[in-house]
Design a protein with these regions (language model features):
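Amphipathic alpha-helical coiled-coil/heptad-repeat segments
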Residues: 86-130
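DNA target-recognition domains and sequence-specific DNA-contacting regions of bacterial/archaeal
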Residues: 1-87
Length: 130
């Protein structure tokens, strides 16, 4: 295991933004106890924001476009802190994120079904032509 750590640096629900390299600008939601290195930015919602809404907002903002374009792309936290955007009140944010999460669950279910059907087709062809 590369980079194993036996303790955690963050606990709770966070949006994590890839800060360097190939994952620069990628956005994911994490929950529980996690260890984040200096190659990730942890975003925790305050009392005025919904974490899952921030996930969708930051993903939509395509943060990778703000990376330095050197040999290894990198996002500077101070550059991201200067970005401005208007957001609705928390209750509306929660409704929006719930709505989008419903779509994400449907998309994930369809992707699993497609993968299953693709595997079934491949197995059928192997049985047929072998």
């Amino acid at each position: 295991i590369r980079g194993y750590c036996d303790h955690y640096s963050h606990e709770g629900e966070y949006v994590v933004v890839g800060r360097q390299g190939a994952l620069c600008g990628n956005v994911r939601l994490i929950q529980g106890q996690n260890y984040l290195s200096e190659h990730a930015i942890a975003v925790r919602a305050n009392e005025k924001n919904d974490t899952k809404f921030l996930l969708y907002l930051l993903d939509f903002m395509n943060l990778g476009q703000y990376s330095d374009q050197g040999a290894q792309p990198g996002l500077a936290v101070n550059k991201l802190l200067r970005l401005k955007c208007n957001v609705p009140e928390k209750k509306t944010q929660s409704k929006i994120s719930s709505f989008l999460l419903t779509y994400d669950k449907q998309i994930a279910a369809q992707e699993r079904l497609l993968s299953f059907l693709t595997d079934q087709r491949k197995a059928f062809l192997q049985q047929l032509f072998i």
